[in-house]
Curated annotation (Swiss-Prot):
GO molecular function: 5'-flap endonuclease activity; enzyme binding; zinc ion binding
Species assigned in the record: Caenorhabditis elegans
Protein's name in the database: Structure-specific endonuclease subunit SLX1 homolog
Enzyme Commission number, as recorded: 3.1.-.-
Protein's gene: slx-1
PROSITE patterns membership: GIY_YIG
Cofactor(s) needed by this chain: a divalent metal cation
Loss of function: phenotype: Reduced brood size, increased embryonic lethality and increased larval arrest. Increased number of rad51 foci in meitotic and mitotic nuclei and increased germ cell apoptosis. Hypersensitivity to ultraviolet C, nitrogen mustard and camptothecin but not to gamma irradiation. Increased chromosomal abnormalities including increased intra- and inter-bivalent chromatin bridges. Increased meiotic crossover frequency in the center of chromosomes III, IV, V and X with decreased frequency in the arm regions of chromosomes III, IV, V and X.
Subcellular location: Nucleus
InterPro entries attached to this UniProt entry: GIY-YIG_endonuc, GIY-YIG_endonuc_sf, Slx1, SLX1_C, SLX1_endonuclease, Znf_PHD, Znf_RING/FYVE/PHD
Family label: Belongs to the SLX1 family.
Amino acid sequence: METFILSSDSDDDSGPPPSKRRTIEGIPRSFSGDKKIRFSFGASNMSQDTTQEIIPEDTDTVPLTIPSTPALSGKFDSKTPKSVRRRSVSMSCFTPIVETINQPPTNQACSSFLQKEYNFHDLSSDEEGGDGGAGCSKDEDKIIEDNLNLRALLSPEKKKRKEKIEEVQNEFYGVYCLISRSDRPCYKNRCYIGYTVDPNRRIMQHNGGRDKGGAKKTDSRGPWDMVCVVHGFPNHVAALHFEWAWQNPLVSKSLKEKQLRKERKETPFAFQLRIACELMNSSAFCRFALTFRWLITTEELPFPTSCVPPDHTKLRFGKVKKEMSLVPSKREDYLEMGECRICGKDIEKLWSLVRCISATCPSHFHSKCLSENGLKLKNEHVDHVYPLKANCPTCGQFYLWGDIIREQRRIIKISTKCAEEFQNMVVRKELPHREISPISSKK
């Protein structure tokens, strides 16, 4: 580290003046030997006979002279601007600044890095003047390597973030039944019916109270257990209709003619189970591809013999797992919409496309063409708009119409998240899905 000595002409008048002297006004120009050190002073109106020198040690360069600090007790020229006066007064702090420059750096790694960088620049300049920079020795390679290593220590690069994998959650619309486990007799074994898109999150909200997002009717009446859930609705509107009819069986259009009442020896949950089975058999919901799931298997009850759920209703056990579908970013993961295998016309809109649920069948259809084909096979085209179940006209695979619509909505949802160039294309079937298991809640 080079040091600088600050001297004044007024202290040494006997000696001969330096060979070359330059008075600095404002910002000095760069000169060879100043080692890129700059000082800025506003001393345009100061006397030029009082100057100070900055003489680098062990150098043959011309000393740098700067104006000396005027006495603070003296008066400034009235024509001197205030900004210049401030800068002139601030020059009284010049000596401690130079002393700070002379202090060695606290970080030894920084010190060695700066010294090696300086030596490396000198070597490179010598070679350019000598042999034209032809080849580097092993010592120079080592200097370059140390230079890069130290530079990494001084300014480490930020870690690159991992590319975020785009996913969409498969739609889930469910209507559930809760049972109260309260110690108070007035609330014990009471039931509550609700709608949710995430049963595992919803039960925690109910047990957390209204502050956590629970319902008013479940606040301070728990803890609650989510015993069963009915899901597989094509959209949230159908699920909300099912919820309201389950909550109000005496006034709903689907069940008011039956006037369902709780029997004397029937538990509250057994009565709610009977209402759910009646709803699944009603004309409004019997053609949906629904699933009845027992979330707590120890609470399972036999279905009432008078109203067993329809044959196509699936029965499942265990907690619901979130299903995530990958949104691919490569061209080979998408297919063209192509033409309808029934009418032979091109499919122009993605929302009008449906496809077979078989993993090996590549057929695409218009939703209207496939529904009419299924209705004709079952002779239901007079009374219904869409079939309950049918077979694929290409491969013969059995399907439920609710599964066809659920796959169509998944394709549309992926198209809204993918790149713009793939929005009018169909994602492949064999792409991997991801399931998120629910976290077991501690009671």
